């Protein structure tokens, strides 16, 4: 860059130039002197009415400095100094004019002395007084005007950045397009930098500056002062574009009011002023080892020193430069007072009877004022702090402009690192920490400050509010209080710059903590690029389960703060999963991506995220921030739970065991458990009430003692395996604190040397060695080294006693274990007796090491990273870089006590213990590398091979080819480019393809379109404009006739008929007729017709008429269209009491009914027929009734002739009471003459069958007795037959019946069989040949071994019956049958393959069953080498499959089925099927209902069932004399002994249900036994829960009752030991169930506890439901007059008949007269939707809720809540 040249011009030219510039200069001075600066770099007048004069170029911080590169002019503003002809002069563009103006500019030094912005003037003058020279200085401003876009000449501009038909200032069109998307940078970017936005250059690595004109020198990190130092260039020459003259001008710029000073030496300047490596938007990222311990990837350009000031050590060091605030800080330091408007919510916990509940109450809106950074309201207990500055690196705001910094940072914003050790001293920060401790709870909010000047990025203030722990706070507004701004001295003014935030920043992101103001002579650094979530705060979720976000944080955060730390999902209105993050910092497309645990500080820095600032991260524990993560630590006596985020007491995992007592009364423990358990298992469950040998009472829930042993609440306990126990060593902060205190009081070496490595607890073994060959008695101490990286530990003496700690160390002694100490030589010194060199006044005589006293001197034990000086008297730094630890992959930088590797690009730093090395980075593993191609990793780099559809660009990346740029790609459609390809899409309706684009189609050219209207073409469509009488169709593409009849306005009193374009009226209503033109119905005058209203006056009305002034005896009708007679018999004034009033014209008469007589002409009195006459004698009593009488007949008589006399009831003719006998009617009764085999019943007198088979001796031992009506029969066994009398079984003599059955052998009859005997003992009988043959000589014949095929047939397999239309092998007869047993009996198929049995006439059947059907071989029985066969007992082979509902009886061959009563045998199914008695038995006057094995007759009132049970007859008395419950009542027996009933219930009879469910054990004259009280039948009969059955079956939604009275009970398993319900198992009734009745427990034995109804919260009590059928007694199924006996309900008899009282969950279907299930999931009439956050499943009589992922079931009303 050449030096500026001063050009002399003539006075005319200068006057002309100043004449053109004078208005602009005056406007500049007048406008900016009172201008307010906003956050986008614009100067605006203080008055709102003043016009905006000008604005600097761009919206970056370059506009804030005094150096102005160019100005944009407004579209209609003239350019000063140039005429319109010169402005538009062809052939000479704006760059040429600028070059000419540049040539006429004065020198840079002159310009800087003449042009000063108000901001720099205030910064440069400490007192804020502007000298007259500065006020009257003239401004020389260089102008630049954007070129007119070339696209304006090609056609209309579209898209963004278009202003008034041309590109907006700062933008131009890209090549071959009409879009203003190309930014303009003037002057252009240098050194191959790219123009990202107007006047914003993105620099390549190694360059910086507003135009990338400077080269960044390489810098090293100096740990002494924690700031980077530029490396000296070769020969000390300055970088490009930087000369000594230029440096001199820099100093002149900073100090404009001082005389010019000579330029300082370049070497001194480079050493004392740190350069900005990350100036501009350079992509250079250099990571240096952070001096802090949190692992922050800090910038190497951080300002050093404790405060925000930076002093220059050059010749101008006497002048102080005040640093401006970091980027993004608005002008809020002048605010003295703010107000905070918030609403507190007070929550309190109330406990009653062992249960605690939280009650919250919202308070009033409260306003607190913060004066001087903090405010306090002593009445409400609230305290607030606010900060106008962001506290970085985990710092906390504790007052106005005051940050409390953690141990690893310092400075005003906590933006500076501090040297090691990493933990802060105990005394540091105690002054401010005391403000944050105490009983109050603290909440932190980062909010924008309202009531301030308009700005793009409003000021963010951090408000910390201390409030009572039971309160929560919601802040509504943080506002600045006007009129409370104090004047600020000029030296403390802030240079306001354009504020931008990096990617992902929000109100919580302190991204600008490490920024440095621009150096003198440089353009200020541009701000970071705004992110896509600029200024956006959302909800952070800690867990994501199956796509559902859960566990949200209690405060709003930005996406980067959330996803970079502990969050898994983030969003504002809907959550989205966090994107993946790289393993190390990566810059792609100008954006910096930070690894997990870090966030962007600016475009080139990643800063560690302090997760400990997140509320509620470590519950009840202390959060410690670490590098890229965090840890939760606990106090002594506490430990982390399995979640590693909460501290629990050691008592929660105690393994001490003792007895657990289930009851504790008056300090006495009873009911101990058998097994010893821990206290937390005993007390955390609901079982134990006390524990231990001392009977320690379990703490109540909700108390602190309960939370100590049960931190997870009721039902949960920790085990020692869940929590990893660890010994707690002394913290580094505790070990290092005495060292810091020692050094604070001494003046020893600088603190950076000895504090490089933290002290760790270690042990050592000291061995006394032999005497050294030195003078005196000095002894040497040999140190055994095994771990050289641990610091020294002061040993104990030879006897094992601990040696006192050395000063400056303060390390407590540990156990006597092996000590690990690095060895060194021994330095022996002499001194007077008692002289201790280690305590001779020096704080640390050895420096970074440990001084060890020897008998005659001392020695130094150096710390790791240090070595003994050659003089052997102190420790010095060890230069590890001489050993090349970085192995050529990076540059080694030695530091005091350590070293670091600065890895080259393509390598990453790996730390292994205390060593560092550079490893190759596999760039191909990073997402997005080589997108559209294949990545190949190389040593230190990588390269891409592009796929088809991609092309390699300049930087080695693959870029998609946009095929749609070619017009011929999609000639007939629309081209859509995609990564690596493209797609041709058909044009939408209304468009046609033309050269790759879709153009509009003119549908109006189509003939016949828009009939009855006019066609109007539109973009992509068309519409019709209709003629009068027509309207548009819904799609607006046609015209249709308007139906005038659709509106009631046409023919409202008639029938409207629509026509094309018109309508007509017809069929007018009564009282109207059609007018002449037929378009309306007019009123008809009915009074004009004769005969209307003959007894009154006719009055015409619209559409009708009325009759008025009726004659006497008449009145107007209700319709008013006639006069009607007055009926005197109506109304309450009826004169005929007890009789019928008959109306006449003008009068009436009384007619009395039969049995009444008229008295006084108006009253009908009853005639008493029973007086003086005996109408019902002699078998009845006369009872008078109103208007009649009836006879009350004696038993055995019935009323006749309408109840006027009594006649005998012929029971023999009506009911047939004598079944099996002859009925003889008597006067008022009857007698039964029973036939043989019947006897009269003692209770009813009817003839009942005598069961002869009750005597076991009947039929003898060889038969089975089968009882029949009036007799019996004997069914004899095989070989026996019935005797002639039929009452016994006698043996059959086969030898007599079967002639020659034994052939030539002798036949001998035996009991039930016979034998064939040969005459000679040398012969034996052959059953197959039927004669005797000689015996085999020597021995009996050996049976033949069956073949393999025969053996397979002897294997037991499945036997199948005939399928009868179903699948062939679906009916199994037996599981283990041989083929002969199956196929010779009832089987049809056999075996694993279900092979069919052979037919009876086949050879296979003859071989399988030689003896025929029904005979099987005897296993193991052989005679003369042949198998013996016997009859197959089908009842044994196929017992379960035969004769179901009956008894199987074997015969020879075959079997018979003896079916139970009510069943008949079905030969097809081989079972006893139910016999439908209703088909052949007439249920007279009633309804017959068939049941399984029986039937029932049901009668309708007033009929009742007679004693035969098959006929419905009239009751012998009136219905009033027989209540509903008197049907089928009998004696109830209280005791049954040996099947004999005794102790009948005296006083009244009961029903079967009432007897068995109360105290009875049997019922009726037949002594019918009641079911056992522990059986399921009893539970169903008496409507009680069966405890044992419920425990076996688990939890049921409904009890198993069916009929009978009783409340709606729930099984006992729904209740705990104390009677309290388990809310986790509540069904869908939405109410807490009541426990079973206490009186039912008396039937369960003495050991069953009686359950008491628990205390229920009022909000859970169900409302009282009044059941109108609750007072009726439930009937048994056989007693019910409804089909199926009211399943899912109870049958009750009411006066109208029978009905069903349905159980809960069912409703009565009156059409089916049955209880059907209620689908609760479709019932939308409830108070709240069922199963919120889940889906509802309907079940029989109930429903279930299935919660969605991330939700769990909640007690109370059925809904699902988010999982915590």
UniProtKB/Swiss-Prot annotation:
Glycan attachment residues as annotated in the record: 175, 330, 408, 602, 1160, 1255, 1376, 1514
Biased composition (Polar residues): 108-128
An annotated GO cellular component: extracellular region
Ranges where the EGF-like domain occurs: 181-213, 383-415, 608-648, 834-876, 877-919, 920-959, 960-999, 1000-1040, 1041-1082, 1083-1124, 1125-1165, 1166-1207, 1208-1248, 1249-1290, 1291-1333, 1431-1473, 1474-1513, 1676-1716, 1717-1761
Record PTM text: N-Glycosylated. Contains hydroxylated asparagine residues.
Subcellular location(s) of the protein: Secreted, Extracellular space, Extracellular matrix
Region feature C-terminal domain, mapped onto this chain: 1585-1764
Annotated disulfide bonds: 185-195, 189-201, 203-212, 387-397, 391-403, 405-414, 540-562, 549-575, 563-578, 612-623, 618-632, 634-647, 660-682, 669-695, 683-698, 684-710, 838-851, 846-860, 862-875, 881-892, 886-901, 903-918, 924-935, 930-944, 946-958, 964-975, 970-984, 987-998, 1004-1015, 1010-1024, 1026-1039, 1045-1056, 1051-1065, 1068-1081, 1087-1098, 1093-1107, 1110-1123, 1129-1141, 1136-1150, 1152-1164, 1170-1182, 1176-1191, 1193-1206, 1212-1223, 1218-1232, 1234-1247, 1253-1265, 1259-1274, 1276-1289, 1295-1307, 1302-1316, 1318-1332, 1359-1382, 1369-1394, 1383-1397, 1435-1448, 1443-1457, 1459-1472, 1478-1488, 1483-1497, 1499-1512, 1532-1555, 1541-1567, 1556-1570, 1557-1582, 1680-1691, 1686-1700, 1702-1715, 1721-1736, 1731-1745, 1747-1760
Pro residues: bias regions: 257-266
Domain TB: 538-590, 658-710, 1357-1409, 1530-1582
GO biological process assignments: response to alkaloid; supramolecular fiber organization; transforming growth factor beta receptor signaling pathway
Region (Heparin-binding): 94-115, 226-243
One Gene Ontology MF term: microfibril binding
Signal peptide: 1-35
InterPro entries per UniProt: ECM_structural_protein, EGF-like_Ca-bd_dom, EGF-like_CS, EGF-like_dom, EGF-type_Asp/Asn_hydroxyl_site, EGF_Ca-bd_CS, Growth_fac_rcpt_cys_sf, NOTCH1_EGF-like
Name of the molecule in the record: Latent-transforming growth factor beta-binding protein 2
Annotated organism of origin: Rattus norvegicus (Rat)
The organism's taxonomic lineage, starting at the top: Eukaryota, Metazoa, Chordata, Craniata, Vertebrata
């Amino acid at each position: 860059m050449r030096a500026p040249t001063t050009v002399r011009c003539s006075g005319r030219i200068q006057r002309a130039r100043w004449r053109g510039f004078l208005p602009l200069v005056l406007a500049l001075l007048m406008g900016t002197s009172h201008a307010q600066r906003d956050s986008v770099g614009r100067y605006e007048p203080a008055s709102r009415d003043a016009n905006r004069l000008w604005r600097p170029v761009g919206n970056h911080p370059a506009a804030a400095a005094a150096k102005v590169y160019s100005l944009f002019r407004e579209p209609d503003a003239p350019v000063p100094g140039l005429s319109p002809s010169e402005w538009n002069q062809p052939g000479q563009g704006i760059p040429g004019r600028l070059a000419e103006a540049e040539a006429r500019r004065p020198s840079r030094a002159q310009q800087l002395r003449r042009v000063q912005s108000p901001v720099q003037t205030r910064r440069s003058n400490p007192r804020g007084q502007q000298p007259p020279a500065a006020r009257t200085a003239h401004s020389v401003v260089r102008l630049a005007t954007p070129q007119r876009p070339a696209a304006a000449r090609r056609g209309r501009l579209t898209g963004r950045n278009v202003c008034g038909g041309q590109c907006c200032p700062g933008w131009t069109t890209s090549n071959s397009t009409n879009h203003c998307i190309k930014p303009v940078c003037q002057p252009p970017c240098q050194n191959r930098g790219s123009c990202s936005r107007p006047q914003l250059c993105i620099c390549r690595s190694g360059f910086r500056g507003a135009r990338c004109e400077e080269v960044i020198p390489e810098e090293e990190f100096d740990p002494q002062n924690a700031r980077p130092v530029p490396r000296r260039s070769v020969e000390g020459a300055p970088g490009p574009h930087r000369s000594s003259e230029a440096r001199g001008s820099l100093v002149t710029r900073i100090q404009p009011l001082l005389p010019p000073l000579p330029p300082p030496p370049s070497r001194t300047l480079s050493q004392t002023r740190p350069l900005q490596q990350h100036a501009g938007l350079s992509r250079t990222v250099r990571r240096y080892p952070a001096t802090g311990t949190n692992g922050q990837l800090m910038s190497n350009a951080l300002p050093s020193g404790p405060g925000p000031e930076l002093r220059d050590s050059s010749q101008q060091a006497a002048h102080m430069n005040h640093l401006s605030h970091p980027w993004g800080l608005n002008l809020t330091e002048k605010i003295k007072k703010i107000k905070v408007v918030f609403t507190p919510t007070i929550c309190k916990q109330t406990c009653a009877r062992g249960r605690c509940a939280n009650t919250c109450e919202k308070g009033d809106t409260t306003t607190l004022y913060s004066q001087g950074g903090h405010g306090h309201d002593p009445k409400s207990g609230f305290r607030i702090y606010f900060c106008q500055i962001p506290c970085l690196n985990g710092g906390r705001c504790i007052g106005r402009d005051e940050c409390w910094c953690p141990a690893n940072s310092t400075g005003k914003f906590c933006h500076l690192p501090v040297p090691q050790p990493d933990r802060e001293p105990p005394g540091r920060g105690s002054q401010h920490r005391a403000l944050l401790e105490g009983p109050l709870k603290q909440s932190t909010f980062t909010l924008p400050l309202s009531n301030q000047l308009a700005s793009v990025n409003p000021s963010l203030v951090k408000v910390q509010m201390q409030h009572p722990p039971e309160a929560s706070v919601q802040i509504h507004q943080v506002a600045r209080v006007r009129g409370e701004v104090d004047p600020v001295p000029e030296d403390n003014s802030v240079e306001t710059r354009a504020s931008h935030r990096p990617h992902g920043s929000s109100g919580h992101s302190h991204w600008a903590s490490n920024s440095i103001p621009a150096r003198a002579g440089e353009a200020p650094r541009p701000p970071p690029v705004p992110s896509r979530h600029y200024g956006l705060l959302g909800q952070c979720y800690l867990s994501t389960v199956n796509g559902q976000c859960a566990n949200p944080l209690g405060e709003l955060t930005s996406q980067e703060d959330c996803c970079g730390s502990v969050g898994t999902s983030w969003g504002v209105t809907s959550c989205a999963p966090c994107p993946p993050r790289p393993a190390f910092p990566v810059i792609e497309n100008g954006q910096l991506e930070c690894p997990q645990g870090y966030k962007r500080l600016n475009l080139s820095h990643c800063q560690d995220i302090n997760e400990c600032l997140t509320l509620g991260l470590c519950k009840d524990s202390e959060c410690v921030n670490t590098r890229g993560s965090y840890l939760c630590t606990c106090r002594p006596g506490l430990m982390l739970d399995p979640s590693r985020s909460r501290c629990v007491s050691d008592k929660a995992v105690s393994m001490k065991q003792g007895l657990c007592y289930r009851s504790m009364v008056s300090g006495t423990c009873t009911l101990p458990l058998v097994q010893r358990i821990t206290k937390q298992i005993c007390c955390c469950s609901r079982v134990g009430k006390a524990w231990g040998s001392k009977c320690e009472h379990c703490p109540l829930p909700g108390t602190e003692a309960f939370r100590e042993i049960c931190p997870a609440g009721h039902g949960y306990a920790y085990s020692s395996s869940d929590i990893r126990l660890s010994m707690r060593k002394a913290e580094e902060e505790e070990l290092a604190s005495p060292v810091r205190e020692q050094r604070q009081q001494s003046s020893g070496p600088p603190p950076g040397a000895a504090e490089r490595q933290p002290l760790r607890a270690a042990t050592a073994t000291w061995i006394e060695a032999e005497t050294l060959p030195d003078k005196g008695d000095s002894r040497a101490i040999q140190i055994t080294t095994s771990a050289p990286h641990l610091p020294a530990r002061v040993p104990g003496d030879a006897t094992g006693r601990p040696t006192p700690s050395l000063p400056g160390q303060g390390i407590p002694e540990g156990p006597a274990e092996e000590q690990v100490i690095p060895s060194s030589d021994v330095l022996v010194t002499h001194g007077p007796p008692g002289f201790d060199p280690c305590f001779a006044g020096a704080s640390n005589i050895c420096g970074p090491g440990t001084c060890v006293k020897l008998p005659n001197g001392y020695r130094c034990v150096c710390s790791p990273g240090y070595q003994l000086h050659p003089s052997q008297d102190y420790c010095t730094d060890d230069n590890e870089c001489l050993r090349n630890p970085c192995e050529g992959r990076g540059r080694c930088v030695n530091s005091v006590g350590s070293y670091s590797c600065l890895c080259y690009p393509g390598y990453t730093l790996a730390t292994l213990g205390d060593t560092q090395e550079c490893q190759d980075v596999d760039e191909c593993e990073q997402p997005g590398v080589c997108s559209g191609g294949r990545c190949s990793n190389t040593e230190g780099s990588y390269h891409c091979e592009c796929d088809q559809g991609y092309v390699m660009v300049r930087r080695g990346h693959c870029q998609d080819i946009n095929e749609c740029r070619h017009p011929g790609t999609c000639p007939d459609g629309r081209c859509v480019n995609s990564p690596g390809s493209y797609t041709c899409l058909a044009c939408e309706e209304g468009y046609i393809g033309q050269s790759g684009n879709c153009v509009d189609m003119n549908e109006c050219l189509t003939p016949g379109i828009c009939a009855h209207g006019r066609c109007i073409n539109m973009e992509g469509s068309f519409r019709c404009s209709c003629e009068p009488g027509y309207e548009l169709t819904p799609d607006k593409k046609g015209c249709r006739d308007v139906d005038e009849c659709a509106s009631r306005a046409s023919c409202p009193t008639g029938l409207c008929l629509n026509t094309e374009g018109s309508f007509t009226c017809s069929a007018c209503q009564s009282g109207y007729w059609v007018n002449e033109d037929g378009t309306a119905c007019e009123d008809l005058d009915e009074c004009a017709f004769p005969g209307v209203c003959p007894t009154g006056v006719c009055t015409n009305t619209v559409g009708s008429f009325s009759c008025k002034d009726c004659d006497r005896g008449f009145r107007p009708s209700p319709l008013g269209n006639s006069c009607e007679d007055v009926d005197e018999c109506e109304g309450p004034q009826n004169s005929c009491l007890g009789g019928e009033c008959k109306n006449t014209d003008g009068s009436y008469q009384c007619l009395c009914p039969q049995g009444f007589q008229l008295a006084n002409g108006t009253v009908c009195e009853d005639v008493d027929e029973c007086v003086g006459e005996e109408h019902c004698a002699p078998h009845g009593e006369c009872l008078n009734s109103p208007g009649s009488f009836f006879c009350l007949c004696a038993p055995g008589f019935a009323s006749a002739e309408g109840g006027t006399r009594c006649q005998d009831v012929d029971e023999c003719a009506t009911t047939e009471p004598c079944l099996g006998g002859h009925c003889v009617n008597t006067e008022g009764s009857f007698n039964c003459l029973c036939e043989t085999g019947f006897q009269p019943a003692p209770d009813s007198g009817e003839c009942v069958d005598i069961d002869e088979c009750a005597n076991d001796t009947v039929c003898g031992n060889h038969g089975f007795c089968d009882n029949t009506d009036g007799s019996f029969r004997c069914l004899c066994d095989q070989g026996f037959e019935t005797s002639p009398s039929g009452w016994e079984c006698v043996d059959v003599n086969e030898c007599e019946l079967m002639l020659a059955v034994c052939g030539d052998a002798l036949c001998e009859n035996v009991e039930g069989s016979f034998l064939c005997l040969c005459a000679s003992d040398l012969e034996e009988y052959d059953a197959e040949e039927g004669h005797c043959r000689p015996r085999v000589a020597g021995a009996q014949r050996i049976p033949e071994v069956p073949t393999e095929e025969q053996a397979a047939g002897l294997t037991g397999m499945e036997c199948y019956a005939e399928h009868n239309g179903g699948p062939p092998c679906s009916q199994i007869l037996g599981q283990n049958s041989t083929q002969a047993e199956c196929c010779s009996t009832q089987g049809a198929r056999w075996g694993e393959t279900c092979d069919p049995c052979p037919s009876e006439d086949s050879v296979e059947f003859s071989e399988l069953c030689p003896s025929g059907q029904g005979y099987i071989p005897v296993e193991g029985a052989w005679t003369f080498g042949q198998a013996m066969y016997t009859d197959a007992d089908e009842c044994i082979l196929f017992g379960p499959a035969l004769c179901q509902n009956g008894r199987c009886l074997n015969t020879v061959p075959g079997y018979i089925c003896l079916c139970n009563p009510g069943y008949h045998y079905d030969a097809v199914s081989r079972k006893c099927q139910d016999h439908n008695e209703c088909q052949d038995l007439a249920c007279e006057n009633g309804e017959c209902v068939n049941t399984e094995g029986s039937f029932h007759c049901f009668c309708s009132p007033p009929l009742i069932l007679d004693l035969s049970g098959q006929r419905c007859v009239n009751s012998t008395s009136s219905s009033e004399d027989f209540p509903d419950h008197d049907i089928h009542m009998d004696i109830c027996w209280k005791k049954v002994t040996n099947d004999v009933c005794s102790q009948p219930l005296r006083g009244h009879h009961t029903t079967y249900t009432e007897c068995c469910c109360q105290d009875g054990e049997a019922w009726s004259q037949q002594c019918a036994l009641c079911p056992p009280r522990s059986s399921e039948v009893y539970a169903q009969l008496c409507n009680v829960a069966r405890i044992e059955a419920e425990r076996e079956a688990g939890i049921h939604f409904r009890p198993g009752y069916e009929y009978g009275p009783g409340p709606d009970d729930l099984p006992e398993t729904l209740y705990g030991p104390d009677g309290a319900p388990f809310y986790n198992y509540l069904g869908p009734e939405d109410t807490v169930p009541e426990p079973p009745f206490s009186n039912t427990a008396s039937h369960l034995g003495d050991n069953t506890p009686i359950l008491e109804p628990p205390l229920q919260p009022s909000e859970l009590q169900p409302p009282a439901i009044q059941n109108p059928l609750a007072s009726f007694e439930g009937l048994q199924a056989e007693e019910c007059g409804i089909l199926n006996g009211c399943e899912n309900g109870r049958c009750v008899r009411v006066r109208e008949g029978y009905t069903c009282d349905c159980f809960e969950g069912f409703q009565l279907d009156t059409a089916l007269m049955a209880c059907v299930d209620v689908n609760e999931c479709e019932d939308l009439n409830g108070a709240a939707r069922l199963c919120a956050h889940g889906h509802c499943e309907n079940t029989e009589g109930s429903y279930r809720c299935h919660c969605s992922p991330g939700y769990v079931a909640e007690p109370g009303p059925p809904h699902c809540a988010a999982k915590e």
